[in-house]
């Protein structure tokens, strides 16, 4: 394949109606260069060295008296801005546009003769060397801007990007395919179309979400990956919903036809998995429908060895977008070094395929696009392809969006948008070429709107004519792109009509041969759907011990700063207190310091850490201070980049004000780099429910559905402290509802040392079959609570404990109170004021998996026990009560009374008034500590 493109030198900018003034300034420049602004000095220097420019400008200027130039400039500007409204981008059922701006020569009282007398340089700053006059140039622009590709870029604020696009679009360029390449492209389309037709005929009514109508998507992806291969990009991450997914799996990831057809026949597809290991397909024990599944292909089919990944995706359209971005960034980051990661955007690229109804309809897209240029999230430019079949299930565009195009919402992110006719396959290839060039040049997103149609209903059981009869009258009569392109090649003499039909038949023959290999009796039989044995146990404690000197060395390093670095005095006093656990007998390690010490030891073990969230560098509650700021210069210093013997990176970023996209990004990052300790911290745990789709459809179910492992950790500040219903609850109950089959660990801690050991245990589980998400109901006021802070000897040895108790005299205990997190601390502090040896407080540090054995063993040691009580801050219908009740009920059986103390059932999580909160909280504590 060759690209014929005429290169031209840089020429002066448009002057339009100000041309006369510019010529006067040019004369001034010739007399005294310093008499004009610096930018014009540079421009006029170029003009001075090109004898052809000034005469052309002066000739043009003489015709300017009647406003001709002004009208020419308005015409040119309109073509660039609005030519897309008359572009030939609709294969069928073109919309009837109203109020289209003026776009014709006659609309501006211009004619051929007038335009032939004007320099082509007026039309575009690089046309003077290409066309004889403005008329020729305008004809070229009309053809370009009203052709099978509609370009939108004038909304971009960056002048360099806008100028690059203008020159790239307007410079004569044609993707020239030789005959062999045209035949190869036709064969690609024949395979795409033939696959769909075969399934449609042989598995009538089976859902497959056909690609027909936007078939060019597959050649576009193949072209993209080929260009990426030439550029040395060896990791391609693709995200898409279900439309066309089976075709992408078979023709981009090269999943064998036998495997795909086996899934339609409900037989075991894995017997047809390539033995060379080039195709990785993971599976969970519950499984998922075939059009949600992804895979990873290692192949050199596109010119170099590449890893092509199609992400697993639920039916929640578009939610995979941030996951793909996170996976891409993980592939780009080098984390096996001290300090911060280095990011090479040339290592990997994301391709995200959207639907035209879902793209403007789902806010996750805009959260994700907002990540595009942020330091902590950029992937060097994503290629977005809208598979625009101009319908969403039964909803037509007039009811689906408030804009002209589904892509209009992308304009706010300053990205170019190309609309391309899905029936013009060569135009779709050109759109990809320009998009990839732009990404390479500017490392920014590009959106391609592949405008086609949907051959059948939303799924193959659906009859679209019930709700959309008129469009489907024309769609049913419209030839497939395979036939459209095939006839074009026949007319060009590239292939004969017999060859065209012969190859179409050959595709069907290959599919039939694959079908015949499958034994219908080989049915899949897995009624028990058992989870892996590795998940039988809870997260295992990390029993590694540390010497006092080792932790002191780390602590000293974290409190050492560059010479001349000026820390705010108020903050410096806080940080200096972190020396006390090592030089004072009564010194205690608080929550933030425990975290810093844990992170440092994890980095020494060679596990990279990535922590993101709103305000996470400092911490919402001003406790972490992981990134320090010089109060005089504003420069930053990150102590965790300078840990002694550090073997992996520490990466921390304040996230944008987004939850869903950021959590999806971190999930994807961890799936791609399973060695990375990824942590997302909510500003308040209450806001975590903005990410509920990621929790439900990925984090807690991905391994069960897809065999996709994640060890993402969530820090969710949670405690009832009188701050109202939106700053109290991380909705603990929802995470406990999602907990099953040892798919996660959920904790609510009361000890800084237990937090230290928990973080180390989670880090140790990464990249193993034991890895799973960790949910931490993290503290707020407890961050500085001395009851939570612990002496350093609790950090030098031991491991994570699922339950904690104080010392007790077994025969005196008649009442056991089970509580968690801040509720446990409140009870402990209240009991300290009025000691009662008959009451034993037990901190349930790990809620899931529930520590039944540990509690049962404890209760067995108490011969005079009469009552077990569960105490919580949350309303009875929230928090942990409904989750723990079945477990505790079994433990107490008929031996002890079981009671509940907490807020009554409420619709809202907490009281809005701080004083009322205190009254309610104190009453709960008072009632709980009564020993009847």
Curated annotation (Swiss-Prot):
One of its GO terms (cellular component) is oxoglutarate dehydrogenase complex. The keyword Oxidoreductase applies. Its cofactor is thiamine diphosphate. SUPFAM superfamilies: Thiamin diphosphate-binding fold (THDP-binding) (SSF52518). Its EC number is 1.2.4.2. It comes from the Bacteria. One of its GO terms (molecular function) is oxoglutarate dehydrogenase (succinyl-transferring) activity. The keyword Transcription regulation does not apply. It is an enzyme of class 1 (oxidoreductase). Homodimer. Part of the 2-oxoglutarate dehydrogenase (OGDH) complex composed of E1 (2-oxoglutarate dehydrogenase), E2 (dihydrolipoamide succinyltransferase) and E3 (dihydrolipoamide dehydrogenase); the complex contains multiple copies of the three enzymatic components (E1, E2 and E3). Belongs to the alpha-ketoglutarate dehydrogenase family. E1 component of the 2-oxoglutarate dehydrogenase (OGDH) complex which catalyzes the decarboxylation of 2-oxoglutarate, the first step in the conversion of 2-oxoglutarate to succinyl-CoA and CO(2). This is 2-oxoglutarate dehydrogenase E1 component. It comes from Staphylococcus aureus (strain MW2).
């Amino acid at each position: 394949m060759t690209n014929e493109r005429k290169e031209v030198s840089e020429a002066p900018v448009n002057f339009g109606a100000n041309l006369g003034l510019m010529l006067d300034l040019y004369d001034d420049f010739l007399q005294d260069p310093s008499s004009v602004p610096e930018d014009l000095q540079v421009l006029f220097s170029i003009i001075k060295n090109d004898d052809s420019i000034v005469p052309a400008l002066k000739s043009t200027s003489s015709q300017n008296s009647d406003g001709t130039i002004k009208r020419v400039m308005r015409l040119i500007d309109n073509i660039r801005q609005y030519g897309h409204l008359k572009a030939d981008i609709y294969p069928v059922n073109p919309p009837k546009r109203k109020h289209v701006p003026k776009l014709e020569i006659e609309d501006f009282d211009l004619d051929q003769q007038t335009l032939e007398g004007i320099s082509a340089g007026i039309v575009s700053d690089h046309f003077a060397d290409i066309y004889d006059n403005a008329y020729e140039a305008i004809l070229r622009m009309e053809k370009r801007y009203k052709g099978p590709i509609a370009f939108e870029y004038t909304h971009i604020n960056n002048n360099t990007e806008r100028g690059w696009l203008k020159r790239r679009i307007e410079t004569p360029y044609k993707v020239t395919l030789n005959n062999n390449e045209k035949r190869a492209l036709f064969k690609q389309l024949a395979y795409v179309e033939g696959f769909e037709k075969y399934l449609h005929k042989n598995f009538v009514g089976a859902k497959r979400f056909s690609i027909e109508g936007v078939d060019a998507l597959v050649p576009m992806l193949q072209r993209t990956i080929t260009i990426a291969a030439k550029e040395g990009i060896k990791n391609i991450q693709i995200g898409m919903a279900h439309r066309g997914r089976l075709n992408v799996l078979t023709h981009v990831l090269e999943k064998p036809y036998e495997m795909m057809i086996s899934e339609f026949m409900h037989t075991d597809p894995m017997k047809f998995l390539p033995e060379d290991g080039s195709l990785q397909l993971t599976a969970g024990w519950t499984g998922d429908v075939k059009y949600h599944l992804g895979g990873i292909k290692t192949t050199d089919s596109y010119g170099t060895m590449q890893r092509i990944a199609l992400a697993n995706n639920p039916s929640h359209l578009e939610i995979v977008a941030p996951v793909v971005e996170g996976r891409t960034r993980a592939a780009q980051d080098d984390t096996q070094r001290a300090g911060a990661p280095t990011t090479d955007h040339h290592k990997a690229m994301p391709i995200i395929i959207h639907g035209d109804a879902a793209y403007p309809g789902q806010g996750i897209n805009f959260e994700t696009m907002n990540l595009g240029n942020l330091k902590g999230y950029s992937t060097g430019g994503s290629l977005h392809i809208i598979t625009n079949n101009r319908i969403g299930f039964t909803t037509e565009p007039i009811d689906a969006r408030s804009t002209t195009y589904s892509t209009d919402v992308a304009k706010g992110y300053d990205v170019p948008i190309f609309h391309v006719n899905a029936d013009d396959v060569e135009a779709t290839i050109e759109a990809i070429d320009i998009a990839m060039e732009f990404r390479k040049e500017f490392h920014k997103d590009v959106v391609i709107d592949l405008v086609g149609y949907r051959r059948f209903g939303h799924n193959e059981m659906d009859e679209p004519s019930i709700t959309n009869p008129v469009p489907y009258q024309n769609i049913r009569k419209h030839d497939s792109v395979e036939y459209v392109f095939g006839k074009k090649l026949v007319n060009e003499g590239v292939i004969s009509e017999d060859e065209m039909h012969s190859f179409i038949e050959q595709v069907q023959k290959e599919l039939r041969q694959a079908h015949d290999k499958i034994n219908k009796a080989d049915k899949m039989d897995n009624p028990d759907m058992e989870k892996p044995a590795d998940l039988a146990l809870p997260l295992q404690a990390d029993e590694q011990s540390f010497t006092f000197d080792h932790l002191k060395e780390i602590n000293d390093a974290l409190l050492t700063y560059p010479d001349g670095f000026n820390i705010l005095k108020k903050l410096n006093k806080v940080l200096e207190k972190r020396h006390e656990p090592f030089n004072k007998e009564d010194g205690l390690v608080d929550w933030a310091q425990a975290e810093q010490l844990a992170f440092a030891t994890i980095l020494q073990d060679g596990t990279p850490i990535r922590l993101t969230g709103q305000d996470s560098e400092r911490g919402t509650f001003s406790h972490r201070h992981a990134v320090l700021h010089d109060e005089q210069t504003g420069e930053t210093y990150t102590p965790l980049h300078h840990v002694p013997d550090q073997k992996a990176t520490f990466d921390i970023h304040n996230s944008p004000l987004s939850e869903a996209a950021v959590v999806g990004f971190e999930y994807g990052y961890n799936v791609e780099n399973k060695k990375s300790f990824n942590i997302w911290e909510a500003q308040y745990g209450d806001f975590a429910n903005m990410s509920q789709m990621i929790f439900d459809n990925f984090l807690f179910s991905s391994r069960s559905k897809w065999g996709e492992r994640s060890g993402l950790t969530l820090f969710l500040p949670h405690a009832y402290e009188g701050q109202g219903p939106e700053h109290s609850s991380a909705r603990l109950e929802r995470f406990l509802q999602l907990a099953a089959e040892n798919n996660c660990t959920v904790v609510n801690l009361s000890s800084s040392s237990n937090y230290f050991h928990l973080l180390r245990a989670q880090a140790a589980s990464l990249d193993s079959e034991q890895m799973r998400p960790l949910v931490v109901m993290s503290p707020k006021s407890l961050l500085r609570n001395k009851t939570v802070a612990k002496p350093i000897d609790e950090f030098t040895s031991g491991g994570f404990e699922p339950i904690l108790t104080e010392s007790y005299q077994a025969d005196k205990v008649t009442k056991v109170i089970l509580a968690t997190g801040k509720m446990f601390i409140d009870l402990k502090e209240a009991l300290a004021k009025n000691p009662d040896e008959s009451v034993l407080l037990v901190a349930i540090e790990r809620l899931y998996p529930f520590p039944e054995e540990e509690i049962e063993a404890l209760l067995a040691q108490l011969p005079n026990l009469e009552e077990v009580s569960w105490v919580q801050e949350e309303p009875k219908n929230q928090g942990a009560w409904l989750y723990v009740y079945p477990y505790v009920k079994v433990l107490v059986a008929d031996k002890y009374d079981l009671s509940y103390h907490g807020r009554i059932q409420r619709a809202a999580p907490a009281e809005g008034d701080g004083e009322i909160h205190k009254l309610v909280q104190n009453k709960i504590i008072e009632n709980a500590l009564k020993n009847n």
